């Protein structure tokens, strides 16, 4: 597919949208010319206890990086997500929970959610949890995880959600870094028909002597599986709720007080605890949720992420609930019990908006039309993509097969550190180009710079930076502001460096080319791995591809590609040659792969991110330097790749 393919805004979408093109242009212009005025007006969507007088106090100067929004105002996040909705929509559904087993589901109204949050907030207070204390949440995708987050917000405790797929060692590192006082977990998790020993993992994590800050472990009963019990430390969630009052006054919190810490995955060394604060984060999550997804009251909105990632925080919990939306919480995986699961959930719950990851889209696409067999899908109005750049072929399949050419796709780009979406189409305002995140959201000023930090104008490729602050921006790394400054503001002074490369086309649309550390330098030519991967996946026999650089005597770096074929396709030397020629045709001879390794699967985190670090190590035969692979969705993939690599080398 040509990158120039353009999908204009559909007239029926433009006629009913919250934000048409003229509105977008006017609002964006105001947001960058007069950010104080723009955000002062937008902040009225929140309920304040003490109104703010000052809007924006921010500096990107690397000698004094300081980010404050609405600093003298006070409010409570849980109040904004629950209490203020009770009068008008107390009996409306807040959360639809779909269990791992298709026979399990629950609907929870705003009134019911409010009562449970108040009870659990009181229970936490009863366990000596107070404003500023850190609570670690290590739970499956069940409503109690959302309750725990909101209960912390209600009493001013800081939550640190750790994804349930992380190992005991990774969990311990995150507990130690923030001196967590309480850990909330479940007996076991359920995912894809398999049980995860969450409580046992917590027990193992807490054998580390440096986790001594933890005083209590609160355990939610999910499976009823047998677990070890420490009667001095462990408490059942349900027993706390049985005796707790459902009345709990929300704590008045300063706009810049900490709301949560979220540790970024995949980084080496000490975990990086991204810190988000109260008012700016909530405002930005709510506004982006409303405008990017063009959300209307009463619609069913489904983000398939896990609450252990920032997408789950902003677009399952805080954004939707602040807007009084109905948010769907899914415990399982897209291919269990079979590949039709996503389609069946859409029809079962009459989902209007689906926000998922390219990994899930490609998994469905690899099965052809099987994933939508027998599906109606007529409730869908809008599709979204998040987590990595989506290649044009997967975009087109998503648009044609899942959306039946009726649903715009919002291809969103953002990061844990940004708090919310920074670059994305708005359904009623933006003509779509498959593979492009298109244009910046209100208040966001993206730019491209060369490696010396010089701004690049017009159609070009470079390092993606943001020139000024926005309310959802992370304020620091927990307990390590110097590292925050060094990581994001030292590379290009006076700018926030995203770590991503991007291309801007002649229409001003942005195309994310991948992490800058995923840029190859082949014979002096810079190439994003995403570009080569997109070309490879465009081949009709290829389901997925991952590209890494390897040392090359002549070129400096060679191109090493791991290829997963579609179901029913067989690997062969002839196909290898065909794929090399295909990439030469799609991009040019410079992008021709030096090595192609067949892969039954790729090493991915549970959120679907490919762990390229592991692929690089395998490609260079550094089998003993892979690091911790326990966080992978399927650690067994790694040994298969190593064995195949050894066989290739021996041949």
From Swiss-Prot:
Post-translational modification N6-acetyllysine, affected residues: 609
SUPFAM superfamilies listed in its UniProt record: Acetyl-CoA synthetase-like
GO biological process, one term: acetyl-CoA biosynthetic process from acetate
Binding site for Mg(2+): 537, 539, 542
Positions annotated to bind ATP: 387-389, 411-416, 500, 515, 526
Molecular function GO labels: acetate-CoA ligase activity; AMP binding; ATP binding; metal ion binding
GO cellular component: cytosol
UniProt catalytic activity: acetate + ATP + CoA = acetyl-CoA + AMP + diphosphate
PROSITE patterns given in the database record: AMP_BINDING
PTM characteristics: Acetylated. Deacetylation by the SIR2-homolog deacetylase activates the enzyme.
Similarity comment: family membership: Belongs to the ATP-dependent AMP-binding enzyme family.
Protein role: Catalyzes the conversion of acetate into acetyl-CoA (AcCoA), an essential intermediate at the junction of anabolic and catabolic pathways. AcsA undergoes a two-step reaction. In the first half reaction, AcsA combines acetate with ATP to form acetyl-adenylate (AcAMP) intermediate. In the second half reaction, it can then transfer the acetyl group from AcAMP to the sulfhydryl group of CoA, forming the product AcCoA.
Protein name: Acetyl-coenzyme A synthetase
Organism, scientific name: Pseudomonas syringae pv. syringae (strain B728a)
Gene label: acsA
């Amino acid at each position: 597919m040509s990158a120039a393919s353009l999908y204009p805004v559909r007239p029926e979408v433009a006629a009913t949208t919250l934000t048409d093109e003229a509105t977008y242009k006017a609002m964006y212009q105001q947001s960058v010319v007069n950010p104080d005025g723009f955000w002062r007006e937008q902040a009225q969507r929140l309920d304040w206890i003490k109104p703010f007088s000052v809007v924006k106090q921010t500096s990107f100067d690397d000698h004094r990086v300081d980010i404050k929004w609405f600093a003298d105002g006070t409010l409570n996040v849980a109040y904004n997500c629950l209490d203020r909705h009770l009068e008008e929509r107390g009996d409306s559904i807040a959360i639809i929970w779909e269990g791992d087993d298709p026979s399990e589901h629950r609907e929870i109204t705003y009134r019911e959610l409010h009562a449970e949050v108040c009870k659990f907030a009181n229970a936490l207070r009863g366990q000596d949890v107070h404003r500023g204390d850190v609570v670690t949440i290590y739970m499956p995708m069940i409503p109690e995880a959302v309750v725990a987050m909101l209960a912390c917000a209600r009493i001013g405790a800081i939550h640190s959600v750790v994804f349930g797929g992380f190992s005991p060692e990774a969990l311990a590192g995150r507990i130690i870094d923030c001196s967590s006082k309480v850990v909330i977990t479940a007996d076991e998790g359920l995912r894809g028909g398999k049980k995860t020993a969450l409580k046992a993992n917590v027990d193992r994590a807490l054998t580390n002597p440096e986790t001594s800050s933890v005083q209590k472990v609160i355990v939610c009963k999910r499976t009823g599986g047998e677990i070890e019990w420490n009667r001095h430390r462990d408490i059942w969630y349900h027993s706390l709720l049985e005796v707790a009052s459902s009345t709990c006054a929300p704590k008045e919190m300063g706009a810049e007080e900490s709301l949560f810490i979220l540790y970024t995955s995949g980084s080496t060394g000490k975990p990086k605890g991204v810190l988000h604060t109260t008012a700016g984060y909530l405002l930005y999550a709510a506004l982006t949720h409303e405008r990017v997804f063009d959300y209307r009251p009463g619609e069913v909105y489904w983000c398939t992420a896990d609450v252990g990632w920032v997408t789950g925080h902003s677009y399952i919990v805080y954004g939707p609930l602040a807007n009084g939306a109905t948010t769907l919480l899914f415990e399982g995986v897209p291919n269990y019990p079979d590949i039709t699961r996503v389609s069946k959930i859409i029809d079962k719950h009459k989902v209007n908006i689906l926000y998922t990851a390219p990994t899930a889209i490609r998994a469905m696409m690899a099965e052809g039309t099987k994933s939508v067999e027998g599906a109606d899908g007529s409730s869908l109005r809008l599709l979204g993509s998040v987590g990595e750049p989506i290649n044009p072929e997967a975009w087109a399949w998503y648009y044609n097969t899942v959306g039946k050419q009726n649903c715009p796709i919002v291809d969103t780009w953002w990061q844990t550190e940004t708090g919310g979406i920074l670059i994305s189409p708005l359904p009623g305002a933006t003509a779509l180009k498959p593979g492009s995140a298109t244009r910046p959201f209100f208040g966001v000023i993206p730019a491209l710079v060369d490696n010396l930090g010089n701004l690049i104008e017009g159609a070009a490729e470079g390092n993606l930076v943001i020139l000024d602050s926005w309310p959802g921006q992370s304020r620091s790394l927990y307990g390590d502001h110097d590292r925050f400054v060094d990581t994001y503001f030292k590379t290009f002074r006076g700018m926030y460096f995203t770590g991503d490369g991007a291309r801007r086309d002649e229409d001003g649309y942005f195309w994310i080319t991948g992490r800058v550390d995923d840029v190859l330098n082949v014979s002096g030519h810079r190439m994003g791995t995403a570009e080569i991967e997109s070309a490879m996946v465009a081949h009709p026999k290829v389901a997925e591809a991952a590209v890494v650089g390897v040392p090359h005597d002549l070129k400096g770096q060679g191109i090493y590609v791991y290829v997963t074929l579609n179901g029913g396709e067989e690997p062969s030397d002839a196909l290898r040659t065909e794929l090399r020629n295909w990439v030469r045709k799609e991009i040019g001879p410079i992008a021709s792969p030096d090595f192609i390794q067949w892969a039954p699967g790729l090493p991915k985190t549970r959120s679907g991110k490919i762990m390229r670090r592991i692929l690089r190590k395998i490609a260079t035969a550094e089998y003993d330097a892979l690091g911790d692979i326990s966080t992978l969705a399927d650690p067994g993939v790694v040994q298969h790749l190593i064995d195949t690599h050894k066989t290739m080398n021996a041949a």
